[in-house]
Amino acid sequence: MGRRVFLVAAALLAASPACGTDGGTAAPCTFTVSKNAVSAKIPTVGEVEWSLAGRPPSSAKIVWTRQDPAGSTLNRGGEAPVDLTKPNYRTLLLGLKQVSAYAFHIEAVRGGQTCVSPDYALPFTGSLTPSPDVSVAVSEAAAREPGFIVTSSGQSVPTSAFILDADGDVVWAADAPDSTGRALMDYAGENMWMVALNPINEGGEMRYVSMDGEQAQQNIAGLENAHHDLTVMPGGKVAALVWSTPGNDPPSDLVIRSPDGTLNTAFTIGSNLYAADSGLYHADAVHYLPFDDSFTISDRNPNLVVKVSATGTLDWQLGGTCAGAPAGDRCSAQGWLVNHGHHLLADGTFLLFNNGQNDNGDVNHIIQFKLNDTRASFTAALVEDYTGTGSGNNLGDVQRLPGGNTLVTYSIEGKIVELDPDWNEVQTFSVRVGYASWRPSLYGPPPRA
């Protein structure tokens, strides 16, 4: 039998059976919930503040469930880790569906025992504005990977950053700059960062908004020339592609912003890393790799991706021509034309979104390699060249999911396709987007930064 659900307008007090120890004696688990609300700014975000009588807990989490979900629903609930350093243990419940009922309880560990509160009813969630229209076509329901997709409206209007759950429902949304290329939660999952595409170097914008919508900053100083993409790093740092000089397709800088607003140019993305195409550069995607503190960077003009250490040391080049390449014998020439989103895993699996020359009617491809990257050599073996179901000469993304599925984002055609390990379609979300990033929950570091 489920626990009784309580909802009181003011403070909520509840005692569960004695658990934990306080000075060596059993102590009752008496919880006080001082705030139980949904955010006024983003009404799919729950806000809970609480306390536990007696000895403070050493760890805690809040577990919630949606009331009466349909049988096919994947997003039925979740759990939020509690930051015990925050006042009143303030915790946000993220990933809630619009206009839905939820119940939650608190689990707190102290003295080697777990205190579990009764269930409390969260106020009904509200409707999101802006919230794009999304249609979903499911081919293999049992093969869907639970989780969330963090994305943006791309080049469509109205502009927004938003999050989809695995059912195709929008569970979070906020205003975004015009033509937002990437929206991405920071490493701690506290803020949503966004960057405008700014493809022709005429002025861009980076901004962020907290996940409850209460804190925001537009037009981040010093990043007015940011373009296309950003990536997040531990410690609240954000790294962005920034045009180095005025003009058409110049080199870029990788600029890292710290939480205190300090900007640091880590390195230039230009002839020091690879040869331009007829003197033109166009870096268009970047990802931070926590497993060896490095970055992968894509450039559509010379049709290549490079891997660079956080201090600017070139590791390898994949794609383009190797004649005179700064990577030397750590270069693997390839014949594809135009590339954007990509994903490098720690085991050497590498996936690339290959746009092709769409003025010739080319269909987008997803190319998978197995990279062998050692101190002595670098090689790339082709594993798969998947012919996609969309076309578009800019943007586009790909990500390998933990369960073996692959998420393909056709930004121009306005669809995100989940494929099973055999490259069969699992489901398709039809919605106009920029780049897109999957994550299993909305807490903690992303699986692909």
What annotation goes with each model-predicted range?
Residues G20-D22:
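Bacterial signal peptide processing site
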Residues V8-A9, G71:
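Intrinsically disordered, low-complexity segments enriched in polar/charged small residues
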Residues G24-S127:
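Short, surface-exposed linear motifs at loops/turns and structural transition points
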Residues A15-A18:
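C-terminal motif of bacterial Sec signal peptides marking the signal peptidase cleavage site
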Residues R3, S34, G46, R76-A80, ...:
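Generic preference for well-ordered secondary structure
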Residues M1-V8:
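Bacterial N-terminal signal peptides that target proteins for export
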Residues A37-K41, P57-S59, A101, E107-A449:
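Histidine-/acidic-rich catalytic cores in large beta-rich domains
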